[in-house]
């Protein structure tokens, strides 16, 4: 089976949203061993559902400008200052205050699965 795809837009997405898209591929029969293994891996590491990840991404927009950084935060859902700081180093051009980091943690904790 051969597909011809054209990329119209490109976005960074959290793990749980990627998992949703891969599940759609599997459900339509467009699966392979690699796709199945990727789905299984994402299923094992997702910390929140796709709706919660989308909400985290949206709420973080006012604090974290870069989409790639928001996607990593919504994927791994860090809950300590140190964990958040370890992600924020991805964007060395922005300095985040302790207050901003605490707000990031509050947003994530609203949606993270226990």
Swiss-Prot record:
Organism: Sulfolobus acidocaldarius (strain ATCC 33909 / DSM 639 / JCM 8929 / NBRC 15157 / NCIMB 11770)
Pfam families: RNA_pol_Rpb4 (PF03874)
EC number: 2.7.7.6
GO molecular function terms noted in the UniProt entry: DNA-directed RNA polymerase activity; nucleotide binding
GO biological process: DNA-templated transcription; DNA-templated transcription initiation
Catalytic class of the enzyme: transferase
SUPFAM superfamilies from the UniProt entry: HRDC-like
Chief location bin: cytoplasm
Domain of life: Archaea
Protein name: DNA-directed RNA polymerase subunit Rpo4
The record's account of how the chain is modified after translation: In purified enzyme appears as 5 forms, each differing by about 200 Da of a covalently bound, negatively charged residue. Not glycosylated.
Keyword field: Cytoplasm, DNA-directed RNA polymerase, Nucleotidyltransferase, Transcription, Transferase
Primary role: DNA-dependent RNA polymerase catalyzes the transcription of DNA into RNA using the four ribonucleoside triphosphates as substrates. This subunit is less well bound than the others. Probably not involved in transcription initiation.
Catalytic activity, as annotated: RNA(n) + a ribonucleoside 5'-triphosphate = RNA(n+1) + diphosphate
One GO cellular component term: cytoplasm
Subunit structure: Part of the 13-subunit RNA polymerase complex. Forms a stalk with Rpo7 that extends from the main structure.
């Amino acid at each position: 089976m051969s597909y011809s795809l054209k990329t119209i837009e490109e976005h960074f997405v959290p793990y749980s949203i990627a998992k949703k898209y891969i599940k759609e591929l599997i459900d339509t029969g467009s699966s392979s061993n690699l796709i199945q293994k990727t789905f299984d891996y994402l299923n094992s590491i997702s910390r929140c559902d796709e709706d919660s990840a989308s909400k985290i991404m949206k709420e973080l927009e006012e604090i974290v400008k870069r989409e790639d950084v928001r996607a990593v935060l919504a994927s791994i859902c860090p809950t300590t200052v140190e964990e958040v700081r370890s992600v924020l180093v991805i964007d060395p051009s922005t300095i985040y205050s302790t207050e901003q980091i605490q707000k990031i943690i509050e947003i994530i904790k609203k949606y993270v699965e226990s």
